[in-house]
């Protein structure tokens, strides 16, 4: 065997190993926080789920303008093409009516559909992975109570090669690690609740953090502001900076903005 053939063989073997490692990293599941939540009062669980759906603004991506609630169809433009929010009503055929709580948890926590298909990260499972199992079950319980709508989901309209879903394994290997958000014992209960809302169900980084050329955010950048891909709309920083961020804002200022869409220190949202 010539030296050239040996080198080529070694490179081929190395390529296979690297691709295999990327595929494994990109498709692995985290089951450490996966058991179903302990039974609780059904109505309280549904009400908790309704609160979470509002906090996460699920309706924004899962309700087309003028369409039925949570029936999907909302176009989500990205630099790679357009995706459409799916139907998450309890319709058995076109929604999530045939899903179990475990299936729903799989989507939020591991970024996979009911059949194991890798989900595109326009669905922010990079943040939703931090949602607790109890809250995932509550959100699922609430969605089971909304009016079922028979409306087929629109397939993604992505450019090549981004339409090759298998490539998501490499993206996930680089930018996604499923896992729970552990409370910081050195901080107050209120602080930890705020962190959970911001980094989990509220998925604030999805808009308020800069993205790289592959559409991924970096934890090191924090909530320093960023342009929302495809919309070319700038989401301002949510840091404590007194000039560019929220340093001069009171808790009431933030509450007013979230409730009314009107900011006391900047433009209307």
Language-model features: locations:
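Extracytoplasmic
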Residues: 53, 83-85, 118-120, 202, ...
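Extended, well-folded interaction surfaces typified by the phenylalanyl-tRNA synthetase beta subunit core
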Residues: 151-166
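Extracytoplasmic/periplasmic/luminal assembly and interaction segments
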Residues: 52-92, 96-97
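C-terminal capping alpha-helices of c-type cytochrome domains
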Residues: 20-24, 100-114, 127-153, 249-264
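Electrostatic cytochrome c docking/interface patches
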Residues: 30-54, 170-199
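N-terminal type II signal-anchor transmembrane helix
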Residues: 1-33
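Electron-transfer interface patches adjacent to heme c in soluble/periplasmic c-type cytochromes
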Residues: 78-105, 126-134, 221-260
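The canonical Cys-X-X-Cys-His
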Residues: 49, 55-65, 104, 139, ...
């Amino acid at each position: 065997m010539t030296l050239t053939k040996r080198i080529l063989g070694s490179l081929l073997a190395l390529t296979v190993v690297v691709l295999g490692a990327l595929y494994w990293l990109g498709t692995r599941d985290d089951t450490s926080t996966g058991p179903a939540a302990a039974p609780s009062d059904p109505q309280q669980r549904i009400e908790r789920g309704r609160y979470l759906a509002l906090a996460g603004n699920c309706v924004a991506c899962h309700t087309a303008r003028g369409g039925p609630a949570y029936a999907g169809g909302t176009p989500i433009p990205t630099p790679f093409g357009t995706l459409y929010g799916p139907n998450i009503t309890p319709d058995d055929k076109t929604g999530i009516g045939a899903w179990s709580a475990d299936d729903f948890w799989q989507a939020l926590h591991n970024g996979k559909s009911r059949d194991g298909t890798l989900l595109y990260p326009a669905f922010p499972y990079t943040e939703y992975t931090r949602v607790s199992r109890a809250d995932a079950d509550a959100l699922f319980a609430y969605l089971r109570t909304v009016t079922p709508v028979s409306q087929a989901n629109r397939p993604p309209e992505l450019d090549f090669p981004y339409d090759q879903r298998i490539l998501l394994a490499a993206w996930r290997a680089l930018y996604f690690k499923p896992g729970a958000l552990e409370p910081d014992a050195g901080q107050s209960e209120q602080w930890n609740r705020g962190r959970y809302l911001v980094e989990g169900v509220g998925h604030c980084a999805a808009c308020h953090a800069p993205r790289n050329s592959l559409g991924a955010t970096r934890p090191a950048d924090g909530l320093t502001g960023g342009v929302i891909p495809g919309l070319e709309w700038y989401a301002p920083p949510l840091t404590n900076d007194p000039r560019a961020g929220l340093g001069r804002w009171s808790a009431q200022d933030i509450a007013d903005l979230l409730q009314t869409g009107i900011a006391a220190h900047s433009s209307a949202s």
